[in-house]
Amino acid sequence: MALAIVARTQGDEYQARWFWMNVCRLFEDRTKVFRVTYEQHNIKSFDDIAVSYGAGMTDEDGHPLVADYYQVKFHVTAAGTITWQGMMDPAFINAASVSFLQRLKHAQGQYAPGGIGARFYLYTPWSIDAGDTLASIVSRADGRIMLQRLADGGPRSKMGKARAAWREHLAVETDEELLTILRPLRLRQGPTLQELREALNLRLQLAGLVPVEEGSLIHPYDELTRKLLQAGQTSFTRTEIEHVGKREKLWRGHSVVEHGAYRMGIRSFFRWAEHLEDETDDMLCLLACFNGRKPLSPKLWHTTVFPCVERFLSKMQRGQPYYHLHLHTHASIAVI
């Protein structure tokens, strides 16, 4: 009984801290986020956290992006992994009858028809099983399913068997329908609970919120999240969070030195640049061309990467006196 209570409590803390990590994005200089919601009730699945964007936000492929929805799944131990078959098992998400993939299908049909417009994240400290078919089709760049790899192979291949099983499970007839359902999915491995606490402390300081004292047993943001939920306050803009922070004596403000520079960013690595769009006025995302350190095809350097970078940098010649260039890229891109 005690262990079950600990597991539930730690799961709530994990979700609350990831919520505050996203709340801090509201205070970025060039943020595209205008609202963050805890327990989003208008979406039955992926409702743990919702991040809503203003006009001009795009996904990794340049399509308009309205929101990111998160299902946060904490596990007390590392005694488990994510597999392609497990995603069809309701027990994987502690459900009785509806699987993770079925929830994805429902959410995609409601908020990302055609596979674009929203992204759906599974955020968990568990990793993908290295020996599973899923490991060979999930991008290390951004956690998406690499649809071309999944589509490769005939009915008797590993990919063909996975496609067939998923089609049957989701009650769809064609691979095209299946790939549309999977297109907005992102599988993201989160840190440990302690690592998330440490990362959040840095974000809180940058956002102008009071960090949690190191070694403290009480985490005020965990407790505040519970109290706000009980009061029915679950969705917040920047102004509303600032008001809550001042009321709870967790707001200290911050000053940002702004030199009038136009900030441009290029990203080919996801880690440490997850929200580069919040720090820049204009951003070029090249994640779709890479899987970790390696390009998906050597030809992409000449057909896509170089032309895109060249066009993007040509904007720097259009009359703006100062530029800040943020490069979270492979060294080969940085020297172009």
Spans of features found by a protein language model:
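Catalytic centers of nucleases
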Residues: 4-87
